[in-house]
Amino acid sequence: MKKRRSNLELLLQCFYRKKVYLSVFIVLALYCVNLLIENASSEKNVYDLLMQLTEFHPLTYTIIPTYLVVLTAHFSLGKMHHYLAFRCKDKRQWYNLNVSCIAIVTTGYSVLIAFIMLMQSLFVFRFENKWSTFAVDYYTYHATFLMNYSPLVYSIATLLLLWLLLFLLGLLFYVIFIWTKSPLVSLLFVFLLNIMNAAVTLGKIDTLTPVFFTDRVSIIQYVYKFDLNQDSFPYSIFVYWIMLIAVIYLIGWLVIQRVDFESEKGEKHHAS
């Protein structure tokens, strides 16, 4: 007898859109090649490249837009979401199922970018766990920080920050989707948020920078912007993102209370 698949397995299968993922992979691979060419230098190592994960240009112009493509493709499934809602016993299970799936996809997406960078760097950069000559000379303001923390620790923290940012945007995308029932509206909202962040950053509008994320996703930028003690690791940057995620999660929970879940399940059951 064939084992019945769990709701999470079904939802993850829905997330797997072969053509979309292949297109996203190609775009990411090409962009990472471009970063590799730009950063190729005997004075740099692989950690200089990994630091780019949370830099303004890669995030704004490639990483966030391609991530939004993946989310939009998934939430455009239509009837499959109705079927999955019918399989869930209540709103809480339905909501947490989607949140869990977004977390898993965000993890896979973040690891994929790091994996592409590492594979492309094998024959170009050194992998020793020490700061490059370029980093030491360029980040003179952060000399104390560089002495206290290794590039491996910094790279792991950078990957975690990338995950937190993308998961927050994914959660926001989902909350708007619950409210509007339109993946295109969700895409437009989050994409405009990204554009506004870019405008504030490029325009150097200091009064609005605290509202947006550029200064709080790169540890180097965060330490410089807020003139932090470089002898202590800036754990507050992670607390900031965790608190934001908690707020958006709670807002989503309030929004989903307005959904007539039992009625929708009945309609979906009838439609099937």
Swiss-Prot record:
Q: Which residues form a coiled coil?
A: none
Question: What keywords sit in the KW lines?
Answer: Cell membrane, Membrane, Transmembrane, Transmembrane helix
Compartment(s) of residence: Cell membrane
Q: Where are the transmembrane segments?
A: 20-37, 57-77, 97-119, 155-177, 184-203, 234-256
Membrane topology (UniProt): Multi-pass membrane protein
Q: Name one GO cellular component term.
A: plasma membrane
Name of this chain's protein: Uncharacterized protein BH0177
Tell me the organism: Halalkalibacterium halodurans (strain ATCC BAA-125 / DSM 18197 / FERM 7344 / JCM 9153 / C-125) (Bacillus halodurans)
